[in-house]
């Protein structure tokens, strides 16, 4: 989902 992109950016 979109959370994957958001979290992926924050938890890079």
UniProtKB/Swiss-Prot annotation:
Major localization listed first in the record, in broad terms: secreted
A GO biological-process term: innate immune response
Keyword Membrane: yes
Assigned keywords, A-Z: Amidation, Antibiotic, Antimicrobial, Fungicide, Immunity, Innate immunity, Membrane, Secreted, Target cell membrane, Target membrane
Record family assignment: Belongs to the lasioglossin-like family.
Functional summary from the UniProt entry: Short linear cationic amphipathic alpha-helical antimicrobial peptide (AMP) with potent activity against both Gram-positive and Gram-negative bacteria, and moderate activity against the yeast C.albicans. Has been tested on B.subtilis (MIC=0.8 uM), S.aureus (MIC=7.7 uM), E.coli (MIC=3.8 uM), P.aeruginosa (MIC=45 uM), and the yeast C.albicans (MIC=6.2 uM). Has also noticeable hemolytic activity (LC(50)=102 uM on human erythrocytes, and 82 uM on rat cells), indicating it cannot be considered for therapeutic application.
Summary of the tissues where the protein is detected: Expressed by the venom gland.
General remark: More than 20 analogs have been synthesized to study the effect on cationicity, hydrophobicity, alpha-helicity, amphipathicity, antibacterial, antifungal and hemolytic activities. A decrease of hemolytic activity is accompanied by undesirable decrease of antimicrobial potency.
An annotated GO cellular component: extracellular region
Cellular compartment(s): Secreted; Target cell membrane
Chain positions found as Arginine amide: 12
Name assigned to this protein: Halictine-1
């Amino acid at each position: 989902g979109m959370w994957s992109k958001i979290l992926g950016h924050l938890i890079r």
